[in-house]
Amino acid sequence: MILFTRLLAVSLLLVSGAFAKFQEFDDSDDVAEYDDNDFAEFEDAADEAPTLRPPSQQVPEKEDEIEDDDEEEEEATVELEGQEEFEEDTEGQEGDADAEPYDDEEFENYDDRLDTGTPNKNNDPITIVDVPAHLQNSWESYYMEILMVTGLLAYIMNYIIGKNKNSRLAQAWFNSHRELLESNFSLVGDDGMNKDAVSTGMLNQENDHIYNMWCSGRLCCEGMLIQLKFIKRQDLLNVLSRMMRPVCDQVQIKVTMNDEDMDTYVFSVGTRKTLIRLQKEMQDLSEFCGDKPKSAAKMGLPESMAVLAEMGEVTDGIMDTKMVHYLTNYSDKIESIHFSDQFSGPKIMQEEGQPLKLPETKKTLLFTFNVPGSGNASVKDMEALLPLMNMVIYSIDKVKKFRLNREGKQKADKNRARVEENFLKITHVQRQEAAQTRREEKKRAEKERIMNEEDPEKQRRLEEAAQRREQKKIEKKQMKMKQIKVKAM
């Protein structure tokens, strides 16, 4: 019973306390806001703190009221002290937060708003800096791009113009020479694309500045290759270099003769400067024409021309009246004429020394003509080369008819034997080294085959066979040495 009365008293106290707390709210207060605010009671206590009056204005009251006031003042003082401590803690937390570094991107344009909202007299005045000239949006800022685009356009225009001009010059040459070529050759313009030879009647373009034409079907020769080598007019850099060093367009004609239609000799005529260069570069001229180019003034040719010949008889036989006429009247267009039964092209330069075999030779007539105009050739200049093609046709017939006498033939044969002997002497050491290398490789392969044999009996038989072969080689060498000694005695 006593326990029940105590519980009832405690519950009544709790209900009365809750009712008193509820009475503290105004009608306008938000209950949820009060529940969420943990420090609401401290704020209410601060609001209800009594204001102290001066001692002169205080009215004496009863002792009970004075004691009650003292207790309330002590409670208010405690509450105010707690609130002040809480405010100090919050201020310390805010100071710590201010001390921490913050991200500039998170507070972008924050300083600008502060400056516009609260003007500061201590800030420096705003100064507008001039934009540098190279950053301004004007045509002067793009001078490099303008130069590059201009250069590219100039290169493209030069390529188109140069390519078209080379094509026009080649077509002009062919139109002026077509009738002569078709009257002397049954096949004109074979491109080699078909198994059977077919006359296309047109030039073959190798690239933008070289045009080819193959003609065949004529007596005395296997065929004739014509090459039109124009200046690289499509290349702007080449055009600029020609301003410092002018060059000419060239027409090169190579006639391959039949073996029975040309005798054994080497002959060349042309400008002195060109012959000196060819004598150094060409294999046949350097071997069979050891003398320096001789002047052709005795034969009625201009002073600028010279002659290289294996024998004097060849010069007298080739340089007849008609050939002298062609060379004299068209000396400004003729750079070189080269007749050779030992033609193999330029010298072969190898890093490891001389080649072990003589180069393959063919009986060839080689003509090199310069197009007039000094690099500024026109259609009329290409048509003016027609008489030189007549000279080529005449030279083919002339070479077929010309024959050396008996002494000249013997001298030519001696010269060829001498050249071959000199070549063998030069390459003798290299051929010995090559033969020794082949023998060593053969022995090494034989030893490897014996070592790889798994059957001991078969391996022994192979070793005995190899020894017998070596013994036979030694006996043969000894027999040769004995025969040489007997002949010497």
From Swiss-Prot:
PANTHER family found in the cross-reference section: ADIPOCYTE-SPECIFIC PROTEIN 4-RELATED (PTHR12883), PAT COMPLEX SUBUNIT CCDC47 (PTHR12883:SF0)
InterPro entries noted in UniProt: CCDC47
GO biological process: endoplasmic reticulum calcium ion homeostasis; multi-pass transmembrane protein insertion into ER membrane; protein insertion into ER membrane
Full protein name: PAT complex subunit CCDC47
Residue span of region Disordered: 33-103, 430-489
Organism listed in the record: Xenopus laevis (African clawed frog)
Cellular component aspect of the GO annotation: endoplasmic reticulum; endoplasmic reticulum membrane; multi-pass translocon complex; rough endoplasmic reticulum membrane
A Pfam family it matches: CCDC47
Gene: ccdc47
Amino acid composition bias (Basic and acidic residues), ranges on this chain: 436-478
Signal peptide: 1-20
Residues in the Lumenal compartment per record: 163-489
Biological role: Component of the multi-pass translocon (MPT) complex that mediates insertion of multi-pass membrane proteins into the lipid bilayer of membranes. The MPT complex takes over after the SEC61 complex: following membrane insertion of the first few transmembrane segments of proteins by the SEC61 complex, the MPT complex occludes the lateral gate of the SEC61 complex to promote insertion of subsequent transmembrane regions.
Family: Belongs to the CCDC47 family.
GO molecular function: calcium ion binding; protein folding chaperone; ribosome binding
Biased composition (Acidic residues): 33-47, 62-103
The keyword Transmembrane is annotated on this UniProt entry: yes
Protein keywords: Coiled coil, Endoplasmic reticulum, Membrane, Signal, Transmembrane, Transmembrane helix
Coiled-coil stretches: 428-489
Subcellular location: Endoplasmic reticulum membrane; Rough endoplasmic reticulum membrane
Feature: compositional bias, Basic residues: 479-489
Subunit structure: Component of the multi-pass translocon (MPT) complex.
Residue intervals on the Cytoplasmic side: 21-141
Membrane topology of the entry: Single-pass type I membrane protein
